[in-house]
């Protein structure tokens, strides 16, 4: 677990209004999404029925955007920067959105299904080569845009998949540059179906007592970072549908003590605190995909919970480390680390976010951390918001070990642990024991 910190600031523009188009969705992506089409009666239509049945064709999927053609005033659109709703140049009806430079309109659509496919379409025309953009962002993935430079109205679309924790998206029409006008009209957002991302490995922690030893092994003893705790298996267990990792104050002799030793692991005569670190080492590893973990942290001083991965080949840090979540010193961290020219000395791509900025009561709830990983790029998200990302073109090991290799182009294994004190955990003077780190589920999709 790394702890070099570099501040990352998220910037945004414009104000948004939010429209809830359904009663909401449970963010538990294990719930199936029906692959059916609704008939006028509200019953599901059997897709295997003959097309020429004599019945009228089914209605098209509902448009989830409210006031998509700007016919009913500005609401719920947020029109900003000099863009305006005009009674001319409409594709259909009477009204359209007119944009010029660095202005546009946006709308937040809520009530979407997580891990599902949607299509955003719209009509646009332009009087210059400076593009008009109709796009979508803040849905749990890359911002996507359709580009319009033509003088006549043309329809275009983008298709996107919502994140595992995301039930909303921001749609917009925007012109970035130039002074000549462009127009947008008849935007449409429709549900296309469930995502094709397949669940390939998971633990829902639905049992009681000991963990599934076909999925997990344990770290033991004093392990790293001069942390206070002694890791032992009995501090990790299933309870009430969750993984509990418990830090305890308990004292006994250190079985590895060596009198006169200068190694911090063996110089300690006594174990004063215990905790657990569970790992999929020798059980499961994967290369590329989407890791999703729902967990709850306390943000207490002296604690250092983490969700992280290590590459299966080469020594640290040249095997690659991904800190999907670390929590210490009042911050949430998201880090990538790889090897340099000096042994045991990592190159860090780090970000940290003060828990206080997330608002009151944040630690009372569970939250969803994601690591999206492919051969080109990695992204870490918290509740759908990007905390850190990295291009794999920049994560090449130096000469110390596995020189010239990319440690993020090999399988990785998962670790979940609760450290106490140490280099980053800080003072435990005000910490009450036992203290718990809770994990609801771990899922890997490909």
Language model region names:
Residues 1-8:
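Sec-dependent signal peptide recognition
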């Amino acid at each position: 677990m790394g702890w070099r910190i570099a501040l990352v600031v998220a910037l945004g523009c414009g104000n948004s209004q939010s429209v809830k188009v359904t009663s909401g969705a449970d963010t538990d992506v294990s719930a199936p999404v029906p692959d059916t089409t609704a008939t006028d009666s509200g019953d599901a239509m059997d897709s295997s029925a003959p097309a020429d049945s004599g019945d009228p064709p089914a209605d098209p999927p509902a448009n989830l955007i409210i006031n998509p053609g700007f016919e009913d005033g500005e609401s719920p659109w947020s029109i900003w920067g000099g863009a305006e709703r005009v009674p001319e140049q409409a594709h259909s009806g009477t009204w359209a959105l007119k944009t010029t430079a660095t202005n546009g309109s946006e709308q937040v659509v809520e009530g979407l299904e997580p891990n599902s496919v949607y299509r955003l379409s719209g009509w646009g025309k332009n009087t210059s080569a400076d593009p008009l953009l109709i796009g979508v962002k803040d849905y749990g993935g890359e911002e996507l845009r359709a580009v319009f430079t033509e003088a006549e109205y043309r329809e275009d679309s983008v298709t996107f998949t919502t994140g595992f924790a995301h039930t909303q998206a921001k749609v917009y029409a925007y012109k970035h540059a130039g002074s000549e006008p462009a127009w947008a009209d008849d935007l449409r957002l429709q549900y296309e179906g469930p995502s094709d991302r397949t669940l390939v490995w998971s633990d829902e922690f639905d049992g009681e007592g000991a963990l599934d030893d076909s999925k997990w092994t344990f770290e033991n003893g004093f392990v790293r970072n001069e942390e206070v705790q002694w890791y032992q298996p009995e501090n990790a267990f299933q309870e009430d549908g969750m993984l509990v990792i418990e830090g305890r104050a308990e004292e006994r002799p250190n079985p590895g003590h060596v009198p006169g030793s200068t190694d911090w692991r063996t110089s300690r005569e006594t174990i004063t605190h215990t905790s657990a670190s569970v790992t999929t080492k020798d059980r499961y590893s994967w290369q590329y995909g989407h890791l999703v973990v729902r967990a709850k942290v306390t943000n207490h001083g002296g604690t250092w919970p983490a969700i992280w991965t290590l590459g299966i080949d080469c020594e640290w840090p040249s095997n690659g480390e991904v800190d999907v979540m670390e929590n210490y010193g009042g911050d949430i961290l998201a880090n990538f680390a790889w090897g340099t020219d000096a042994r045991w000395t990592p190159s860090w791509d780090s970000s940290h976010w003060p828990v206080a900025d997330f608002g009151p009561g944040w630690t009372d709830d569970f939250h969803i951390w994601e690591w999206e990983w492919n051969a080109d790029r990695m992204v870490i998200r918290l509740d759908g918001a990007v905390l850190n990302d990295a291009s794999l073109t920049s994560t090449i090991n130096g000469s110390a070990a596995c020189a010239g290799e990319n440690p993020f182009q090999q399988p990785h294994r998962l670790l979940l642990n609760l450290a106490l004190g140490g280099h980053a955990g800080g003072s435990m003077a005000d910490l009450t024991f036992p203290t718990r780190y809770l994990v609801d589920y771990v899922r890997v999709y490909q």
